[in-house]
């Protein structure tokens, strides 16, 4: 089969039922492997907590009760409720803040990857397809950004822009675009002279159609793997910036800010203030890394037999 036929067949699979069989095969392979199933189960649990946290939380996450400050886990709270995971230094329910923190952390993670991926994929496609001065410009901009430690750049931008969820998303997204741009550029360089791309040109397809409808679908698999790893990286970065007081506003609960607030109480043996948000961050990052590792093996034909 020629490259043109393979390209046409690939497009047919995408538009037809091929994706259904791939999804079914992925489900069978994932069920056979325990760790990816556990990772997906935890991420689904975190997503449910993020979406329905407002209904699941027993208390307002910002409601203060100084009489019950630093209460132990399972302590009776106001209105007949229970502080399942204890309360913090201001008497706020840790469990409620943990649920609301999942919403912020996951939203920032996925939104930042969407911003960074959109910028990086577009830049990589244009750079690899057109080459020349545009390629040099985009790659040099990426080199300049990589010359600075990302956390330092993030701190500089957030000091100028101020705290806020959207400012944090933009800063973290900009920090991710170079990775996508370089990978997409390399794949575009290898695909732009292939027979199925030449066939699209011969049929009169526009440049936009060739780039985004012919080349892009053929490079999405590795980007899916990278995105799963990068979500974990962004969540860690958000937690670090919130820990430094440069993330979202103080009244918005996040896992990183909860860790920051626990610093002064660790010496008083109030372990739950650091342990629960720390474990939430650890399990979320670990789950995304396990999922990304499994996706890499599943989508790579050379490694598929191992999954």
Language model features with spans:
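Transmembrane alpha-helical segments of polytopic membrane transport and secretion proteins
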Residues: 1-41, 290-307
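Alpha-helical transmembrane segments of integral membrane proteins
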Residues: 34-44, 90-307
